[in-house]
From Swiss-Prot:
Similarity remark: Belongs to the heat shock protein 90 family.
Protein name per UniProt: Chaperone protein HtpG
Its biological purpose: Molecular chaperone. Has ATPase activity.
Alphabetized GO MF terms: ATP binding; ATP hydrolysis activity; ATP-dependent protein folding chaperone; unfolded protein binding
Gene: htpG
Region called C, residue ranges: 562-634
SUPFAM superfamilies, A to Z: ATPase domain of HSP90 chaperone/DNA topoisomerase II/histidine kinase, HSP90 C-terminal domain, Ribosomal protein S5 domain 2-like
Keyword Chaperone attached: yes
CDD domains (alphabetical): HATPase_Hsp90-like
SMART domains, per the entry: HATPase_c
Chain residue ranges for the region called B: 345-561
Keywords noted in UniProt: ATP-binding, Chaperone, Cytoplasm, Nucleotide-binding, Stress response
Stretches the record annotates as A: 1-344
Gene3D superfamilies named among the record's database cross-references: 3.30.230.80, 3.40.50.11260, Heat shock protein 90, C-terminal domain (1.20.120.790), Histidine kinase-like ATPase, C-terminal domain (3.30.565.10)
Length: 634
């Protein structure tokens, strides 16, 4: 970082990510350039909220002026547009921290996702939240003059940058509290140096802002001619949207308010606005976004609702009102029961908080249930974005486990597609007569699941199997043990019994074959020793000679892989080797009198089974050697 200091004036270099963001924004967001005004007015509104909150404990911060608002003025001759607020303001350190750096975790990961394709970049930048930097879409230079509430006039700060990689910062004198942002407009931004253009944008984006947004207008005489006099005229309604009657709020207003609270560019999928009176008195406005934030799976991802108490802003990202598996929900909660001096620590162990959390959780789950029932296409859109996060729910929220399970979607053998469109309720509706379990299979990929040998008898008998191939699925099934009174059953576990779907003649024939093959099973056990837990015959296969399975209480293959990928110690998985006595290769093995040749057959069949189950084997050389010797003999 380069710095030059002249008295109190410094020239500093931007954090490298800021330079990249400025460049991308100017080129990617130009087609939607009016959003700069939404972002800057939104920031000014936040500054007023923060002042109100701090003034609760220190009223002197108002400095005799508690009428908060945002004012816009322009000067065509100077080519400038100024956005002013009398909110909390910033100190010198605040300015350096907020305007010279992007104080977000995972920024490097975010920038690695950007491409040269403007449409994709603009969407990603929108998810990232551009805030103050959006000013450079229309301005070739920006000046910020600010004084933090409570600081003397001579400790105000001026920040200036042309967005080229560095900025200057110096102390100035500023009598009024708050922030002035002066935009030196590019030629392409001059359209905003117009009263009617500003009115239009403010009405579009800022009607819901809870403080007045005014513009400086020219006073006209009785004949309608302009005079030299100017006045401030409030443009927005200045009533917090969530305090209004639902019937009076249009979809467009709800959508714009969502963009204000989330800094998202896209419209939300659905929302729920509720006023509750009774044991707890509160208003909630909850949104489900249409796109997942780029860092949703990042552990440092900020989530939660905006918290207001009696319409006074208290904090952003109040995570205590929404469980982690619903961390994608945006919006706010306004409570009349929490104290105005509430802190995050107090929220943690507060009965009101727990009650509001439970209510908000149920509200979101109900919203999702309605969407799934009434608009399958929209729900699929939601599932593609947030399905992985929702799968965390059964482990986290025992009380709502059944509701969450009903919202989960999977691939299945019923639908020849990797798309996860099958709900558990529809699976249960299609269950065969006499079927009392929900059968499922976990694998590394859809292709591996779809082609698994474990499916052969299920396909032959027309029994639907749910196919799971997300990394989280094996972990999920430790917590999701039943749905609608039906137990889940992994088809890769030993002891799987499909005999109820067999006729008596088949059962009798299998019994005879099993008896005949006892000696083959014993020879195989003797050869393998403790390399496997057991050797058994199986009749659940058709075109596959052998598989490996695990006991019900043994760790499954996918869970072992998940732990290994996370760097955890993984206990050895002991497999049960199941051979299909009706397969030609197994019959050839059984007919082999020579023990050495018999062993080669065992190696080949076990190796195949391990490859199909794990995608790898401990000793591929031994497997290949056995194949080569058998081929040579042929």
């Amino acid at each position: 970082m380069s710095e030059t200091v002249s008295q109190n004036k410094e020239t500093r270099g931007f954090q490298s990510e800021v330079k990249q963001l400025l460049h991308l924004m100017i080129h990617s967001l130009y087609s939607n350039k009016e959003i700069f005004l939404r972002e800057l007015i939104s920031n000014a509104s936040d500054a007023s909220d923060k002042l109100r909150f701090q003034a609760l404990s220190n009223p002197d911060l108002y400095e005799g002026n508690a009428d908060l608002g945002v004012k816009l003025s322009f000067d065509e001759s100077a080519n400038t547009l100024t956005i002013s607020d009398n909110g909390i303001g910033m100190s010198r350190n605040d300015v350096i921290e907020h305007l010279g750096t992007i104080a977000k975790s995972g920024t490097a990961e975010f920038f690695s996702k950007l491409s040269e394709e403007q449409s994709k970049d603009s969407q990603l930048i929108g998810q990232f939240g551009v805030g103050f930097y959006s000013a450079f879409i229309v301005a070739d230079a920006v000046t910020v003059r600010t004084r933090a509430a409570g600081l003397p006039a001579d400790e105000a700060v001026q920040w200036h940058s042309a967005g080229e990689g560095e900025y200057t910062i110096e102390n100035i004198t500023k009598e009024s509290r708050g922030t002035d942002i002066i935009l030196h407009m590019r030629d392409e931004g001059k359209e905003f140096l117009n009263e009617w253009r500003l009115r239009d944008v403010i009405s579009k984006y800022s009607d819901h802002i809870g403080i007045p947004v005014s513009i400086q207008t020219v006073v006209r005489d009785e004949d309608g001619k302009e005079t030299d006099e100017k006045k401030w005229e409030q443009i927005n309604k200045a009533q917090a949207l969530w305090t209004r009657n639902k019937a009076d709020i249009s979809d467009e207003e709800y959508q714009e308010f969502y963009k204000h609270v989330s800094h998202d560019f896209a419209d939300p999928l659905v929302w729920s606005h509720n006023r509750v009176e009774g044991k707890n008195d509160y208003t909630s406005l909850l949104y489900i976004p249409s796109k997942a934030p780029w860092d949703m799976m990042n552990r440092d991802h900020k989530s939660g609702l905006k918290l207001y108490v009696q319409r006074v802003f208290i904090m952003d990202d109040a995570e205590q009102f929404m469980p982690s598996y619903l961390r994608f929900v945006r919006g706010l909660i306004d409570s009349n029961d929490l104290p105005l001096n509430v802190s995050r620590e107090i929220l943690q162990d507060n009965k009101v908080t727990q009650s509001l959390r439970n209510a908000c959780t149920k509200r979101v789950l109900t919203m999702l249930e309605r969407m799934a029932k009434n608009d399958e296409e929209k729900y699929q859109s939601f599932w593609k974005e947030f399905g992985l996060v929702l799968k965390e729910g059964p482990a986290e929220d025992f009380a709502n486990k059944e509701k969450i399970a009903g919202l989960l979607r999977f691939a299945s053998t019923e639908v020849d597609s990797a798309e996860q469109t099958v709900g558990l309720a529809s699976y249960v509706e299609r269950m065969k007569e006499g079927q009392d379990k929900i059968y499922y299979l976990t694998a590394d990929s859809y292709a591996a699941a779809k082609n698994s040998p474990h499916l052969e008898q299920f396909k032959a008998k027309g029994i639907e199997v749910i196919l799971m191939f997300d990394r989280i699925d094996e972990w999920l099934m430790n917590y999701l043990t039943e749905f609608d009174g039906k137990q889940f059953q992994s088809i890769t576990k030993a002891g799987l019994d499909l005999s109820k779907f067999e006729d008596e003649a088949d059962k009798e024939k299998q019994k005879e074959t099993e008896e005949e093959f006892k000696s083959v099973v014993e020879r195989t056990k003797s050869y393998l020793g403790d390399r496997v837990k057991d050797v058994r015959t199986t009749f659940k296969l058709a075109s596959t000679p052998a598989v490996v399975v695990t006991d019900d209480y043994e760790m499954g293959t996918q869970m072992a892989k998940l732990l290994a990928a996370a760097g955890q110690a993984v206990p050895e998985v002991k497999y049960i080797f199941e051979i299909n006595p009706e397969h030609e290769l197994v019959k050839r093995m059984a007919d082999e009198a020579d023990e050495e040749a018999f062993g080669r057959w065992v190696e080949v069949l076990l190796g195949q089974a391990m490859l199909a189950e794990r995608g790898s084997m401990e000793d591929p050389t031994q497997f290949l050697g056995a194949i080569n010797k058998l081929l040579t003999k042929v």
